[in-house]
């Protein structure tokens, strides 16, 4: 790895950047929850989005503990308890995504439709995005995939720090290149 690539990775992988992207994901998730519930009345997508946003909050908690360096006080059982439930829920999210996409395709659900739009008569017979209202499994499936993203990210994170704790017990020190410890 060249020095230029290393510098770019340190910028992109810096803990503050990770926290920023996670907060963006949480805000986006909350806005999607409100949109699916209030405007589209798509309750399966609302529930799936809420679950994904909760796992994004778990990611924020992990990153915040890493930034504040309190993660070094966690027991290895804490990390072990995080790995398998996150992997299992991620698999359920992936399975849910596939099932939703298959059912949505078989039942000919659309993610957005321009049927009913008439430019010549200057009128709209149906809403331009009529397929987005009510239950739509394309959105539910997409947010199921987001659940997989957050849960597997949390599982890999927990596994990484479980391994660091294991090597730290042998070496006597935990060293993380991604975090600056700020002493007051």
UniProtKB/Swiss-Prot annotation:
Subcellular location: Cell membrane
Pfam families recorded: HRG (PF16954)
One GO CC term on file: plasma membrane
Induction: By heme deficiency.
Any one GO molecular function term: heme transmembrane transporter activity
Function: Heme transporter that mediates heme uptake across the plasma membrane.
The name this protein goes by in its record: Heme transporter hrg-4
Organism from which the protein derives: Caenorhabditis elegans
Gene for this chain: hrg-4
